[in-house]
């Protein structure tokens, strides 16, 4: 306890985290993209290479998953205005939200119904391509739909993939790996929803369940993979490949905005609110957004009050050297996708200069907003996907933050607030009814 007191003396906000209070932290260390980019260790070229790889796989995906055929084998989500929800939030919180609120529906992405369809599927495809190229079975000029042939399935069945997950990452990696022909094992933490485990098993995926949290599931997955030279472990805490799979979203969103005639520039700022677990998904997306929109996009991460691992790590500068359990927080939350006690050190260090801030919200707040969104817009999400929804009113109320960045009333009036909905499109009906019943 003495150590916690010392920590609080140096970092006063820790007291609110320990008390499980909804907390907002505006990052005093935010820099321009030009200053912050070198610390990421990845470049625009890396993201472009990921774009190109996904384009090579498009013919394969269009055939393997017919639901992607209309989009030409591209796994991408809609971005929609949510004016009724914006009004409801203003009414419930008594706070005007300047500008326009939009929802990015990664909750309804093809194949696995969450943001993890970006990174997880991309890393599996990257590994499959690498193996096939090295074996001389494929060239990058081939039509990749050849990967659907029995010969390739046979080849991939000699290899296996392992991952540790609270649910959604396991879902995307499991479904994709099984489709390609890999043997796949998903190590699931105690938070993982039963329906996610059942869905994986229905695809022939081996699910190993733990009574412990996410960190233990990842560690056990890593250990199990080390003993098998043909097993590839997808490391959610450190993977650059996953990160790049998420980063592709930036250019794609820019194209969607261009189609909609939506302007993002110095006088029309873009604020983006991303739910954060270990950090790979929001970190990669935020990196891609920064490359696409430069200093005109402002990214915020959102975490449950019971799992504020990234806020704790970035705010104290301790990154993965501290966990929420170290300050007496239990890491138990209804937002199963965000139930992570120790953040990715890679993501925290890469992105700490490119984030405008982080905030926490209570499980009940997520349930409330889940209900309001269903009532007002007819859109149903899982609890973690609502974490971003609390962002706009926090930003609009934060006059000190607005002054620090020199936002005028006109700029705020022209702003776009994009809430990144991370999952929920595949939640079974009975489970969704339980979620809706918990809202006020």
Swiss-Prot record:
Pfam name, any one: PALP
Lineage: Bacteria, Pseudomonadati, Pseudomonadota, Gammaproteobacteria, Enterobacterales
Biological source species: Salmonella paratyphi A (strain AKU_12601)
Record GO terms (molecular function): D-serine ammonia-lyase activity; hydro-lyase activity; pyridoxal phosphate binding
GO biological-process terms attached to the record: D-serine catabolic process; isoleucine biosynthetic process
Cofactor: pyridoxal 5'-phosphate
Protein name: D-serine dehydratase
UniProt keyword Cytoplasm, yes or no: no
InterPro entries in the record: D_Ser_am_lyase, Ser/Thr_Dehydratase, Ser/Thr_deHydtase_PyrdxlP-BS, TrpB-like_PALP, TrpB-like_PALP_sf
Keywords, in A-Z order: Lyase, Pyridoxal phosphate
């Amino acid at each position: 306890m003495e150590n916690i007191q010392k920590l609080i003396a140096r970092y006063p906000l820790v007291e609110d985290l320990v008390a499980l209070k909804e907390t907002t932290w505006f990052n005093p260390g935010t820099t321009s993209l030009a200053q912050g980019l070198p610390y990421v260790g990845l470049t625009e070229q890396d993201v472009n290479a990921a774009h190109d790889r996904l384009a090579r796989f498009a013919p394969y995906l269009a055939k393997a998953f017919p639901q992607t055929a209309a989009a030409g084998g591209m796994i991408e989500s809609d971005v929609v205005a949510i004016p009724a929800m914006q009004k409801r939030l203003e009414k419930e919180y008594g706070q005007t939200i300047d500008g326009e609120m939009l929802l990015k529906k990664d909750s309804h992405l093809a194949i696995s119904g969450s943001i993890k369809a970006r990174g997880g599927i991309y890393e599996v495809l990257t590994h499959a391509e690498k193996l096939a190229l090295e074996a001389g079975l494929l060239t990058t000029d081939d039509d990749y739909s050849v990967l659907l042939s029995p010969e390739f399935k046979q080849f991939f069945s000699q290899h296996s993939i392992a991952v540790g997950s609270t649910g959604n990452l396991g879902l995307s990696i499991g479904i994709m790996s099984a489709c390609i022909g890999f043997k796949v094992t998903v190590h699931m933490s105690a938070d993982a929803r039963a329906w996610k485990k059942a869905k994986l098993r229905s695809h022939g995926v081996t699910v190993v369940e733990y009574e412990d949290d996410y960190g233990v599931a990842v560690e056990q997955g890593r250990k199990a993979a080390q003993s098998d030279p043909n097993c590839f472990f997808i490391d959610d805490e450190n993977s650059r490949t996953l990160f790049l799979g998420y980063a592709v979203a930036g250019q794609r969103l820019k194209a969607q905005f261009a189609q909609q005639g939506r302007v993002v520039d110095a006088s029309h700022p873009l604020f983006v609110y991303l739910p954060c677990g270990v950090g790979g998904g929001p970190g990669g997306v935020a990196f891609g957004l920064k490359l696409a929109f430069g200093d005109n996009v402002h990214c915020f991460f959102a975490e449950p009050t019971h799992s504020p691992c990234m806020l704790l790590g970035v705010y104290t500068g301790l990154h993965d050297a501290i966990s929420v359990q170290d300050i007496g927080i239990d890491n138990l939350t209804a937002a199963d996708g965000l139930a992570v006690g120790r953040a990715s050190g890679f993501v925290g260090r890469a992105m700490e200069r490119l984030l405008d801030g982080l905030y926490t919200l209570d499980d009940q707040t997520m349930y409330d907003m889940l209900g309001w969104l269903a009532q007002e817009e007819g859109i149903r999400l899982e609890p973690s996907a609502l974490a971003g929804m609390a962002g706009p009113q926090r930003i609009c109320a934060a006059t000190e933050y607005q002054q620090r960045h020199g936002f005028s009333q006109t700029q705020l009036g022209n702003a776009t607030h994009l809430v990144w909905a991370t999952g929920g499109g595949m939640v079974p009906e009975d489970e969704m009814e339980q979620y809706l019943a918990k809202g006020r």
